[in-house]
C-alpha cells in the first residue's frame, strides 16, 4: 500500500511538471532564486491551481517528514529578516554585483561574525541573498525586491515593529497607548508612512486586483445606476469598474484629507471625469447620497462588529427600496473546505486583525448575522469568493416594510466625528480602509472569535 508521503511526492512532481510545461510552451522564464528571476509567473488559472497544489503537497510532505517534535518548536526563522530590515542590508549590496561580508558589515555598522551568521540563516531559510563564494554576497530575487520595492520593505517593518509586538500583547499594550491603531499612526508620521507603504504592498498580492471585483459580481446587470464607493480612497477600484462598465456612475467617498490629496493628484482619466467623482464624507455620519448601490471594499475587517453595524445603519436614511450593499472583504472558509495554502494565509490575516484592531475576518454566517443586526430590512442575499480572488463578495439588499421604523445608529464617542482622527487612508494617502474610532485594543480575552 502506497504511503501518504509517497502520494504527496507524486503530487508535487505531477503538478510541478504541469507548471513547467506551461512555462516552456508559453516561452515564459521559470522561477529562479537568481536576482533577475520573475516576480510573477503569468500562469493561466488552471496552471495556477497546479502551482498551489504543488505547494500544498510539498508543505504537507515537509511537515510529515519533519515530525511532530519539529512542528511544536518555536519559530526563529524571521529573526534574520528583522535584522536585514533594521540595518537596511539589502540596499548596501549592488544590483548585478557582489560585496564581501566584511565590507558589508562595515557599511551596516554591524559586527562581521554576527552579520555572516544572519545572512547565512536568511539564505538557507528565506532564499534572501546568495553566497556564490565564501564570504561574498550577491542578491537573490527576494533580496533585490527589498531594494527596488519600498512597499515590500515597509511590509517587513510593519510586521517586525508593530505586528510582532501586537501579537504578544495586543496593539495598545505593546505600544503603551490608549489610542487605536489609526490614532497612534496619526501621531507618528513615520509609522503612518510605512503603514501606507505596507498596505500598498499587500494590495498588490495575488487575487487583490480590481479585475477580481469586476469579474466576481454581475455589474452589467445593474443597468444605468450610481454606485457610492464608501471609503474608496483614491478611487482605484471605482475607476477600474467605470472603465469596464460604461453604464455605471461612481461617487467615491472618503475623509476631507483624502479627497483633497486625490484632487491634487487628479488620478481620474479625462474620459471618466463625468462618471467618477469624489466627495468628502465620514462613514460614521449619516449618508447624504441616495444611490442604487453602496460599495465597501476592504473596509470592515478593520472594525469589530458593533462598528460595522453602526456604519451600515448610517446608510438607512438614504436607502431606497432595492438599494444594494456590496461588500468586498475576506470570507473565512469553513475548516478543510479550501486549499490549505489559502486557509493558512487567511487565518494568519485573522490573527493580525485581532492583534491590531481587536477585529476579525468573518465567516459567511458572521456576515449574515451582521446584516440582520443592522436592521431586519437589510436582506442578506449571498456571499461568495470569485475564482482566484483573495476577497469575497457579500451582497445585501434594502427591502423596507412601510410601517417599520429604522433603528438608530449607536451614539458613542467612538462613532462621533468630534475629536476623532482621520481614517487609515487619510494618513499619508494610506490605502487601508476604515475610520479611526477610539478602539482600545488592551485586552483580547473577551473577544468573540468564531
UniProtKB/Swiss-Prot annotation:
Keywords: Methyltransferase, S-adenosyl-L-methionine, Transferase. PROSITE patterns: SAM_OMT_II. The active site is at 301 (proton acceptor). Pathway: Secondary metabolite biosynthesis. Gene3D superfamilies: Vaccinia Virus protein VP39 (3.40.50.150), Winged helix-like DNA-binding domain superfamily/Winged helix DNA-binding domain (1.10.10.10). One of its GO terms (molecular function) is O-methyltransferase activity. Disulfide bonds: none annotated. GO terms for biological process: methylation; secondary metabolite biosynthetic process. Its EC number is 2.1.1.-. Belongs to the class I-like SAM-binding methyltransferase superfamily. Cation-independent O-methyltransferase family. COMT subfamily. Non-reducing polyketide synthase; part of the gene cluster that mediates the biosynthesis of orcinol depsidone grayanic acid (GRA), the only major secondary metabolite known in C.grayi. The first step consists in the ring and depside synthesis by PKS16 leading to 4-O-demethylsphaerophorin, involving different orcinol-like rings, one with acetyl CoA and the other with octanoyl CoA as the starter. Further depsidone formation by the GRA cluster-specific cytochrome P450 leads to 4-O-demethylgrayanic acid. This is Grayanic acid biosynthesis cluster O-methyltransferase.
Amino acid at each position: 500500500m502506497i504511503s501518504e508521503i509517497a502520494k504527496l511526492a507524486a503530487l508535487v512532481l505531477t503538478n510541478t511538471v504541469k507548471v513547467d510545461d506551461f512555462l516552456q510552451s508559453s516561452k515564459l522564464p521559470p522561477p529562479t532564486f537568481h536576482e533577475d528571476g520573475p516576480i510573477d509567473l503569468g500562469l493561466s488559472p488552471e496552471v495556477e491551481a497546479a502551482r498551489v497544489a504543488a505547494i500544498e503537497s510539498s508543505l504537507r510532505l515537509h511537515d510529515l517528514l519533519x515530525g511532530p517534535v519539529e512542528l511544536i518548536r518555536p519559530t526563529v526563522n524571521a529573526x534574520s529578516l528583522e535584522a536585514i530590515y533594521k540595518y537596511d542590508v539589502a540596499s548596501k549590496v549592488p544590483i548585478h554585483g557582489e560585496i564581501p561580508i566584511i565590507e558589508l558589515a562595515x557599511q551596516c555598522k554591524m559586527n562581521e561574525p554576527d552579520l555572516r551568521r544572519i545572512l547565512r540563516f536568511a539564505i538557507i531559510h528565506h532564499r534572501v541573498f546568495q553566497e556564490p563564494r565564501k564570504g561574498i554576497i550577491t542578491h537573490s530575487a527576494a533580496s533585490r525586491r527589498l531594494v527596488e520595492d519600498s512597499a515590500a520593505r515597509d511590509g517587513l517593518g510593519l510586521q517586525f515593529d508593530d505586528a510582532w509586538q501586537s501579537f504578544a500583547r495586543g496593539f495598545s499594550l505593546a505600544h503603551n497607548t490608549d489610542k487605536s491603531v489609526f490614532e497612534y499612526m496619526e501621531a507618528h508620521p513615520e509609522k503612518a508612512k510605512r503603514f501606507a507603504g505596507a498596505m500598498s504592498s499587500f494590495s498588490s498580492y495575488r487575487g487583490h486586483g480590481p479585475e477580481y471585483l469586476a469579474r466576481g459580481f454581475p455589474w452589467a446587470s445593474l443597468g444605468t445606476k450610481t454606485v457610492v464607493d464608501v471609503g474608496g480612497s483614491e478611487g482605484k477600484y471605482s475607476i477600474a469598474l467605470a472603465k469596464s462598465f460604461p453604464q455605471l456612475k461612481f461617487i467615491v467617498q472618503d475623509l476631507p484629507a483624502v479627497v483633497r490629496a486625490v484632487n491634487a493628484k487628479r488620478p481620474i482619466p479625462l474620459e471618466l471625469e463625468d462618471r467618477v467623482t469624489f466627495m468628502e464624507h465620514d462613514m460614521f455620519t449619516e449618508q447624504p447620497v441616495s444611490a442604487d448601490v453602496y460599495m465597501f471594499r476592504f473596509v470592515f475587517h478593520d472594525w469589530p462588529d458593533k462598528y460595522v453595524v453602526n456604519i451600515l445603519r448610517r446608510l438607512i436614511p438614504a436607502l431606497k427600496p432595492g438599494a444594494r450593499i456590496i461588500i468586498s472583504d475576506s470570507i473565512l472558509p469553513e475548516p478543510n473546505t479550501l486549499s490549505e495554502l489559502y486557509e493558512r494565509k487567511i487565518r494568519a490575516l485573522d490573527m493580525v486583525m485581532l492583534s491590531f484592531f481587536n477585529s476579525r475576518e468573518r465567516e459567511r454566517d458572521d456576515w449574515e448575522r451582521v446584516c440582520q443586526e443592522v436592521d431586519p430590512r437589510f436582506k442578506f442575499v449571498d456571499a461568495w469568493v470569485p475564482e482566484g480572488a483573495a476577497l469575497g463578495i457579500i451582497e445585501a439588499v434594502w427591502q423596507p416594510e412601510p410601517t417599520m421604523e429604522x433603528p438608530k445608529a449607536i451614539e458613542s464617542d467612538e462613532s462621533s466625528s468630534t475629536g476623532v482622527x482621520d481614517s487609515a487612508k487619510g494618513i499619508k494617502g494610506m490605502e487601508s480602509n476604515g475610520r479611526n474610532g477610539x478602539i482600545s485594543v488592551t485586552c483580547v480575552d473577551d473577544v468573540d472569535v468564531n
